[in-house]
């Protein structure tokens, strides 16, 4: 699925232990979901080599990030634990999606962040990942 540059970041919010990145994609929810559930879509989001399995299944990306699938609801939500590397504390990445107008609203929330984690870098990471996921 190729998404023109109309995909926009609507907000990037931060709290003490979480960040949130919101994008509106001018594609139907069903197309966005199909893209996310294909190998290149999930790799675009989580990193090369990452594959989502059933709830409780681990995933690993070649950049060292890893986690476990926590929740998977078709055309609604994907929630994974996320570790930046083997020594990093567990955090949670929750991607919610819903129809908005003729497109899809994506809301990615990265929770349970420690004070040492660079929130600006994480916002940039997830913003870029969401764009990659919706560009192919």
Predicted region positions:
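Tryptophan-centric aromatic hotspots in well-structured domains and transmembrane helices
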Residues: 33-36, 82, 123-126
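Juxtamembrane/interface motifs at transmembrane-helix termini
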Residues: 52-55, 126-128
């Amino acid at each position: 699925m190729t998404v023109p540059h109309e995909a926009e970041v609507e907000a990037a919010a931060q709290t003490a232990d979480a960040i949130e990145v919101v994008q509106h994609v001018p594609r139907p929810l069903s197309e966005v979901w199909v893209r996310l559930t294909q190998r290149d879509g999930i790799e675009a989001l989580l990193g090369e080599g990452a594959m989502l399995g059933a709830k409780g299944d681990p995933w690993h990306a070649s950049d060292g990030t890893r986690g476990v699938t926590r929740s998977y609801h078709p055309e609604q939500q994907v929630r994974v634990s996320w570790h930046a590397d083997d020594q990093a504390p567990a955090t949670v990445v929750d991607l919610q999606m819903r129809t908005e107008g003729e497109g899809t609203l994506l809301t990615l929330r990265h929770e349970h962040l420690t004070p040492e984690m660079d929130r600006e870098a994480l916002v940039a990471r997830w913003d870029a990942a969401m764009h990659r996921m919706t560009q192919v």
